[in-house]
From Swiss-Prot:
Belongs to the pseudouridine synthase RsuA family. This is Uncharacterized RNA pseudouridine synthase BB_0129. InterPro entries: PsdUridine_s_RsuA/RluB/E/F_cat, PsdUridine_synth_cat_dom_sf, PsdUridine_synth_RsuA/RluA, PsdUridine_synth_RsuA/RluB/E/F, PsdUridine_synth_RsuA/RluB_CS, RsuA_PseudoU_synthase, S4_RNA-bd, S4_RNA-bd_sf. Keywords: Isomerase, RNA-binding.
Length: 249
C-alpha cells in the first residue's frame, strides 16, 4: 500500500520553517508564493515533484511514505539513458525519479536513448519480470514519426514477421496516422526493435514515443514528470498476468 501525503501549500511551507501556518496563509493571500510557475491560491495542495517558491527559496515536495511496493510512471525525454551510470556522462532517466523517493527503484525494461515517453519504475522485482517476459505478451503502444513517408508495405511485413540481421521481429498491429506518422503496438519488448526494422530499410525515425504499457497510459503526464501509478491499475494488470501464468502451467 502507498500512502501519499498531499498537504496544503501553507502547511507545507510552515513545515519547512518559513513561518506559522497563519503567516504562510498570509503570504499566499498576498500572492507571494508560487507552485511551479503558477501563483498559489489558498486551499491549493502540493503534489509529488512540485516546486514551491517563496522569494528566493525553492522547496521541492518529496515527502511521502512507502509501505511495501511502489509503481511509478515517468515521461522520459529524448536523450536520457536508461541506466544507473554512464561513462560518457549522459543524462540518466533514473535521475528524474530517484531524488523524489526514499526507496531504491529501477526501470521496467528500457527506452533507447533517442526515444521518449512512458517508462515504468518499481521496487517489485516479480512484477517487473512479468511485464518484460515475452510469454506475457504485454502490449506496448508507440507513436512514430519519420522524415520520409511511412511505407505501409514495410508495416505489413513487420506485422507478418520480419528478420533483421538474424533477429526476428513482429508487430501486433498498426494504424497509419498521416503520411509521416503511425501508431504501432508491440507485445514483446526486444531491444530497439522499431528502430532496427526501419533502419534496415534506410528509414530514419525522428520520433519514437511510447504512450502505453498494458493498461497504463502516459495520459497528460508532461515530459520529465513522474507520477505514482494507481494500485487499481497495477492490481488489474497483475491479475491478468497471474491468469496467463496459471494457463501456461
Amino acid at each position: 500500500m502507498i500512502a501519499l501525503k498531499a498537504p496544503r501549500v501553507h502547511v507545507f511551507l510552515a513545515e519547512k520553517g518559513v513561518g506559522s501556518r497563519r503567516f504562510c496563509e498570509e503570504l499566499i493571500r498576498k500572492k507571494l508564493v508560487r507552485v511551479n510557475n503558477t501563483i498559489a491560491k489558498l486551499g491549493d495542495k502540493v503534489t509529488l515533484g512540485d516546486r514551491i517558491i517563496y522569494k528566493k527559496q525553492i522547496f521541492v515536495f518529496k515527502d511521502f511514505q512507502i509501505n511495501n511496493r511502489i509503481y511509478l510512471a515517468l515521461n522520459k525525454p529524448r536523450n536520457y539513458l536508461c541506466s544507473n551510470f554512464d561513462v560518457d556522462g549522459r543524462k540518466l532517466a533514473i535521475s528524474l525519479v530517484q531524488p523524489l523517493f526514499k526507496e531504491r527503484v529501477f526501470s521496467i525494461g528500457r527506452l533507447d536513448f533517442k526515444s521518449s515517453g512512458l517508462l515504468l519504475f518499481t521496487n517489485d522485482g516479480k512484477f517487473a519480470n512479468d511485464i518484460i517476459h515475452p510469454r506475457q505478451k504485454v502490449e506496448r503502444e508507440y507513436i512514430i514519426e519519420s522524415k520520409k513517408d511511412i511505407d505501409e508495405n514495410l508495416l505489413i511485413s513487420f506485422k507478418s514477421g520480419i528478420k533483421v540481421k538474424k533477429e526476428f521481429f513482429k508487430l501486433k498491429s498498426y494504424e497509419i496516422l498521416n503520411k509521416n506518422s503511425a501508431r504501432l503496438i508491440l507485445d514483446e519488448g526486444k531491444n530497439r526493435e522499431i528502430r532496427k526494422v526501419f533502419l534496415s530499410k534506410n528509414i530514419f525515425l525522428k520520433k519514437i514515443h511510447r504512450i502505453r504499457i498494458g493498461n497504463i497510459n502516459l495520459d497528460s503526464l508532461k515530459e520529465g514528470q513522474v507520477k505514482i501509478v494507481p494500485l487499481s491499475k497495477i492490481n488489474s494488470l497483475k491479475s491478468r498476468l497471474e491468469k496467463l501464468n496459471d494457463n501456461s502451467n
